[in-house]
């Protein structure tokens, strides 16, 4: 039983992490699959703080997150990754890494820049506009909207629960999960031969 990776992309403040955490909670209730959230900020801060925010560092960040997510999917779990993932090449790399191991779903949180700036409680956008934060996505570094997203959600007028419901429906359809599948215990792992 292969798993899935739900890979979010969108600007800072678009709602990616909020929806990702709510989706994880929803998918974990009564399910047999392990659900793991890979938050872009947390992954970067805890695992590879040496990476910068230039284009190459961003690509490396996405590749590393996707590789970890692919391992989770290969073992039948569901990884929910929520980085900004601003470049089409990085998202294509993520898809290529995941698809041999499981289902890849791209969720584009398309909340407009103006709304993201209004939500910015940390003042990151203001600092970026003042030139204090270089390579800030949407201000001094580009964001390339995807044209291949499985789900597109603008959180300007969409509640978290509605967003989660839309994504969950796609996840379940793509994994062919019925209520019976979710209630059934996970199968034993295949036997391995001694080395």
Predicted features by range, described:
Residues 46, 50-53, 69-129, 135:
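ATP-dependent NMP and nucleoside kinases share a basic, alpha-helical "lid"
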Residues 37, 104-106, 150-152:
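Conserved beta-strand scaffold positions in the cores of enzyme catalytic domains, especially
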Residues 11:
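P-loop (Walker A) phosphate-binding loop of NTP-binding proteins
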Residues 1-3:
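Phosphate-binding P-loop
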Residues 14, 21-70, 74:
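Conserved substrate/cofactor phosphate-moiety recognition/catalytic segment
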Residues 8:
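Hydrophobic anchor at the beta1->P-loop junction of P-loop NTPases
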Residues 110-113, 118-166, 174-189:
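Small-molecule kinase domains that catalyze NTP-dependent phosphoryl transfer to phosphate-bearing small molecules
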């Amino acid at each position: 039983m292969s798993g899935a990776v739900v890979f979010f992309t969108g600007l800072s403040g678009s709602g990616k992490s909020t929806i990702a955490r709510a989706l994880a909670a929803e998918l974990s209730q009564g399910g047999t699959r392990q659900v793991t959230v890979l938050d872009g900020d947390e992954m970067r801060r805890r695992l590879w703080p040496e990476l910068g925010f230039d284009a190459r560092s961003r690509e490396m960040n996405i590749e590393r997150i996707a590789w970890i997510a692919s391992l989770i999917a290969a073992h039948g779990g569901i990884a929910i990754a929520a980085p900004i993932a601003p470049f089409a090449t990085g998202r294509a790399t993520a898809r290529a890494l995941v698809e041999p191991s499981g289902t890849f779903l791209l969720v584009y949180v398309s909340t407009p820049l103006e709304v993201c700036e209004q939500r910015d409680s940390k003042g990151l956008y203001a600092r970026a506009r003042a030139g204090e934060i270089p390579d800030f996505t949407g201000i001094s570094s580009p964001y390339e909207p995807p044209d291949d997203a499985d789900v597109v959600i603008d959180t300007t007028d969409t509640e978290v629960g509605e967003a989660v419901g839309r994504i969950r429906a796609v996840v379940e359809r793509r994994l062919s999960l019925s209520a019976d599948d979710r209630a059934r215990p996970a199968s034993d792992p295949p036997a391995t031969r001694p080395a």
